Amino acid sequence: MYGASTQHNSIYFMRHTRLSIANMDAFECIATKFDIRDFSSQDISPETKSKILEAARLTGSGLNTQHWRFVIVEKKENLEKLAEDSTSGGWVSGANFAVIVLTNPRYKFHMIDAGRVVQDMQLTAWNYGVTSCLFTGVQDEKLRSDFSIPKELNPTIIVGFGFSAKRTSGKRKNRMPLDELVYYEKYGNPVRR
């Protein structure tokens, strides 16, 4: 698969882009990551794919249930099938690979766990210059049939990964200012500066 054994002792990972090679700390990774739906044809190395999947494996889950399972989709015809099975992710057919994140709905926190694992995969990918985007809208029965998803698991989130077809550096995020989002001690109390 993607290398059953991986090294866990690296503190910093290298990010490879067309423009530069740089170490990113967690905050920089969060601050510079964009959702990208337009991918180039450049292949992602098996080592980088392994790191992305290893990040998923290492993510914490509620009560340490580790109830999630992952279907890796790489073949072009299956990526196209995945795009057809979506209601909002037609762009995934252009991804280098995609991950169908399956969770067990018997755990009330399964959606939170799905978000946690996807964020870890996306940030790990971006650390290597690999962009990504997710979608949740699917034709459930069709997706289950096409990818043999068992009835006890939900296809909760699908993430497509690839190198961006366009330049990603220098873009600015459109985010609300912190003082419109955060309150001090009680809702409505402005943050003290």
Q: Model-flagged regions — what are they?
A:
Residues 2-193:
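Acidic, surface-exposed loops and disordered segments
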